[in-house]
């Protein structure tokens, strides 16, 4: 019987060793699997943090661009008005004794035309008033009159020009309206 025990013991011992090896191998596999998933999670977290930082940088850049756009929005118009300013300065620097009323009026007319060109180019348009039906969106009635030459509700006189910039009223025309 002791021989039987000896014979059985090596087999049992081998089985225990195999079981221990399998257990150890399974533990190693789980550890490797856990390490793999931990690395994946860290990589995803790092990617998420970089994306969040990129989004914040984008927000800052867009905010800065919007501020700059608002700050320098009128730069183009200012650049176009500079030659007009130069012409006024030249007129003021001209010899006053040799200047005639006619030459002064000619110079002012030239500057006026130059200014109108700049405004036209930018989209500023005078609002039609006299003889037009009164429109509260573009006209501001400051006086009323009774003139048989005009129909009721028609603008008789323009007291101050009104202007539209593209599709917005910048200043309504001040008008006298027929009752």
UniProtKB/Swiss-Prot annotation:
Residue ranges spanning the membrane: these are none
Tell where it localizes.
Cytoplasm
| Bias-annotated ranges (Basic and acidic residues) | 33-45
Q: Which UniProt keywords apply?
A: Chaperone, Cytoplasm, Stress response
Q: Which one Pfam family would you cite for this protein? A: GrpE
> Which GO molecular-function terms appear in the entry?
adenyl-nucleotide exchange factor activity; protein homodimerization activity; protein-folding chaperone binding; unfolded protein binding
For the region Disordered, what residue ranges are annotated? Answer: 1-45
Q: Which GO terms describe its cellular component?
A: cytoplasm
For this protein, the record's InterPro entries field holds: GrpE (IPR000740), GrpE_coiled_coil (IPR013805), GrpE_head (IPR009012)
Q: What is its main location?
A: cytoplasm
User: According to the lineage, what is the superkingdom?
Assistant: Bacteria
GO biological process terms on file: protein folding
Family recorded in the similarity comment? Belongs to the GrpE family.
PANTHER family according to UniProt:
GRPE PROTEIN, GRPE PROTEIN HOMOLOG, MITOCHONDRIAL
Subunit record text: Homodimer.
Q: What does this protein do?
A: Participates actively in the response to hyperosmotic and heat shock by preventing the aggregation of stress-denatured proteins, in association with DnaK and GrpE. It is the nucleotide exchange factor for DnaK and may function as a thermosensor. Unfolded proteins bind initially to DnaJ; upon interaction with the DnaJ-bound protein, DnaK hydrolyzes its bound ATP, resulting in the formation of a stable complex. GrpE releases ADP from DnaK; ATP binding to DnaK triggers the release of the substrate protein, thus completing the reaction cycle.
Which NCBIfam families does its entry note? PRK14140.1
Write the protein's name: Protein GrpE
| Species annotation | Brevibacillus choshinensis
Gene that specifies this protein: grpE
């Amino acid at each position: 019987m002791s021989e039987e025990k000896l014979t059985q013991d090596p087999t049992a011992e081998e089985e225990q060793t195999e079981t221990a090896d399998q257990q150890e191998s399974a533990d190693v596999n789980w550890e490797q699997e856990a390490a793999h998933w931990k690395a994946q999670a860290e990589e995803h977290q790092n990617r998420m943090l970089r994306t969040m930082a990129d989004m914040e940088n984008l927000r800052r850049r867009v905010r800065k661009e919007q501020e700059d756009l608002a700050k320098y929005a009128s730069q183009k118009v200012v650049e176009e008005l500079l030659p007009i300013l130069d012409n006024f300065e030249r007129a003021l620097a001209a010899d006053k004794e040799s200047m005639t009323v006619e030459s002064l009026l000619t110079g002012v007319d030239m500057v006026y035309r130059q200014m109108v060109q700049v405004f036209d180019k930018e989209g500023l348009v005078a609002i039609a008033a006299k003889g037009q039906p009164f429109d509260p969106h573009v006209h501001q009635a400051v006086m009323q009159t009774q003139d048989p030459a005009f129909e009721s509700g028609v603008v008789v006189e323009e007291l101050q020009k009104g202007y539209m910039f593209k599709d917005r009223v910048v200043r309504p025309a001040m008008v006298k309206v027929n009752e």
